[in-house]
Structure formats: C-alpha cells, structure tokens
Amino acid sequence: MSSSRRNFILDAGLTASGIAVMSNALSSCVSASDKVVVALIGCKGMGFNDLTAFLQQPGVICAALCDVDSNVLHERAAEVEKMTGKRPDLYEDFRKVIDRKDIDAVIIGTPDHWHCLPMIYACQSG
C-alpha cells in the first residue's frame, strides 16, 4: 500500500501530537506508585514506535505485549527488554491484556481494520 506525502505528513503530525499530549497527561496524572504501566496490542510498525516514544518518558513501564505473530512478539519483547531491562509479559489474545488490572494505558497498534474491537474492550474495562 503506497502512501502519499500528504498522508505521511498528516500521520506523522498526528503521532507527534498524540505523543505530546500523552507526555503532558502522563506527567500530570501518575499513579500512586509514580509509574504508568502500559501495554501494546499489535507490535509492528507504528504501535511499536509509539511504545518506544512512551518508554522515553520518565515513569513509564511496559508490562505486556500482544500480537498474533509469535515471531514479532518475541522480537519486540527482546527490544523492550534491551531498552528497559525488563521483559514484558507476552500475549496472543488481546482480551487477556485488557483483563489485567495493573495496566493503566493500552496502545492499540493493530492494523486499521482491527483498531475498533480492542478499543471498545479497553474502554469498557475502564
């Protein structure tokens, strides 16, 4: 799938603004432990780039990764471990990630046609 320059710039701008907003939000509302625990659902491409940006913020911990491709899942887990020193828990079923009570935020990095269902489950779980 090719992308026009306009779409690329729009996507890059939206990603940057989302990271900026999350950076401010994370710094103003940290949990009682002063840590924000995140999980990533969909570990390729933009989702992992978003997670990498989040992990550069102080007080952010990646607790879980989820992807249907176990090769991608293990590759990304190794990268997170290299960045943070801690290996996240791994899942192939996003519902198990959302069911965890220790997760503060979920990054949904699935392909476009798969964003909706994990987002609805995450919103329902609070």
Task: Tell me the role of every PLM-derived stretch.
Residues 1-125:
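N-terminal glycine-/serine-/threonine-rich beta1-alpha1-beta2 phosphate-ribose binding loop
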